[in-house]
């Protein structure tokens, strides 16, 4: 239970990422100064939790000192590729809180194997803007399963968070808001309905984001009608993400940044580059500034001035996706019915 009486409770998955950190600080900036806030930081490991809490505290002191005594921190250790870990996170939230106001589904995972450098050079030479907007040279492993025998990327990015929401719906009921972070690269071409767990897909990350889009359109009306929960779909555009740095050296990193700025200069609205600008749409959605029946993107002008873009999504197949997820949910309810674990164990 929060020590701050009647505080606003926000759970941000993947808080230790660049986007997760910026969602946290922008949410704190966007909420009224008289609001007491409990920020529930999540990560897979305790060191990352400690690091991001320290970083957020430093930001509060330097940028929003009016919030210094208004913010309390809590944490969850949760791995969305592990159903027992998800169940454990549910138990902990259920013990500590009566209501959750904001839930950001930002945790995302890919199974990258590196970069096709020959393909990357050719793409950049042929179409530099397309090469840094919809790249095809990121190599992804095919057929990777989790320990639960589910498609790993499917479980991490789609089913794991979906099951988590299923478990904590009663905490979000009557006013809670869910914000799903999708991607610019979530075209229908990345998903086969014969491979919903993405085990045969060479673009499983993008396919998982297409599934997120379809899941949203198949569930947001029911969530609001039956539970009073508002769900939103957003994407952060293109920004510098920590997850891919391991494949870049100093030259390729700055080369990438140069192409990002070039794309923005030539008119791309999606090359936000800054994680802070990328977090605009997620936080705007949480604060009720976007619509539920579209996908809202973080965007910016050539000079870096931020704004929001509304995008229409082809929702064909959304009912089939939700039906599949609900069937899996029932199966895992049965498998986990006698399982009790401790999320505080690092």
Curated annotation (Swiss-Prot):
Superkingdom of source: Eukaryota
Keyword set includes NADP: yes
Glycosylation sites: 272
Active site: 182 (proton donor), 205 (proton donor), 209 (lowers pka of active site tyr)
InterPro entries in the cross-refs: Ergosterol_Biosynth_ERG27 (IPR051593), HSD17B7/Erg27 (IPR042829), NAD(P)-bd_dom_sf (IPR036291), SDR_fam (IPR002347)
Record flagged with keyword Transferase: no
Entry membrane topology: Single-pass membrane protein
Family per record: Belongs to the short-chain dehydrogenases/reductases (SDR) family. ERG27 subfamily.
Protein name: 3-keto-steroid reductase ERG27
């Amino acid at each position: 239970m929060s020590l701050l009486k009647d505080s606003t409770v926000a759970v941000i998955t993947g808080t230790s990422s660049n986007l997760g950190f910026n969602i946290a600080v922008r949410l704190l900036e966007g909420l009224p100064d008289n609001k007491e806030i409990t920020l529930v930081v999540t990560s897979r490991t305790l060191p990352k939790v400690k690091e991001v809490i320290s970083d957020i505290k430093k930001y509060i002191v330097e940028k929003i000192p009016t919030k210094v005594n208004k913010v309390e921190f809590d944490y969850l250790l949760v791995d969305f590729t592990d159903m027992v870990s998800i169940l454990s996170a549910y138990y902990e939230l259920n013990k500590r809180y009566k209501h959750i106001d904001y839930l950001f589904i930002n945790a995302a995972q890919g199974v990258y194997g590196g970069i096709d450098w020959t393909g990357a050079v050719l793409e950049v030479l042929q179409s530099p803007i397309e090469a840094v907007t919809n790249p095809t040279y990121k190599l992804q492993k095919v057929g990777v399963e989790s320990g639960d025998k589910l498609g790993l990327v499917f479980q991490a990015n789609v089913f794991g968070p979906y099951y988590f929401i299923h478990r904590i719906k009663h905490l979000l009921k009557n006013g809670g808001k869910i914000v799903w972070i999708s991607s610019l690269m979530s075209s229908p071409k990345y998903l086969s309905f014969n491979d919903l767990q993405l085990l045969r897909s060479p673009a499983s990350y993008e396919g998982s984001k297409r599934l997120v889009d379809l899941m949203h359109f198949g569930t947001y009306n029911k969530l609001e009608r039956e539970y009073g929960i508002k769900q939103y779909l957003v994407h952060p555009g293109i920004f510098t993400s920590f997850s891919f740095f391991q494949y870049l050296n100093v030259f390729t990193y700055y080369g990438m940044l140069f192409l990002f700025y070039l794309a923005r200069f030539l008119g791309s609205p999606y090359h936000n580059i800054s994680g802070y600008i990328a977090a605009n749409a997620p936080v705007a959605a949480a604060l009720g500034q976007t619509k539920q029946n579209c996908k809202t993107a973080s965007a910016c002008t050539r000079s870096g001035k931020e704004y929001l873009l509304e995008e229409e999504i082809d929702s064909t197949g959304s009912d089939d996706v939700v039906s599949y997820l609900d069937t899996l949910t029932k199966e895992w309810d049965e498998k986990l019915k006698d399982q009790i674990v401790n999320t505080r164990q690092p």
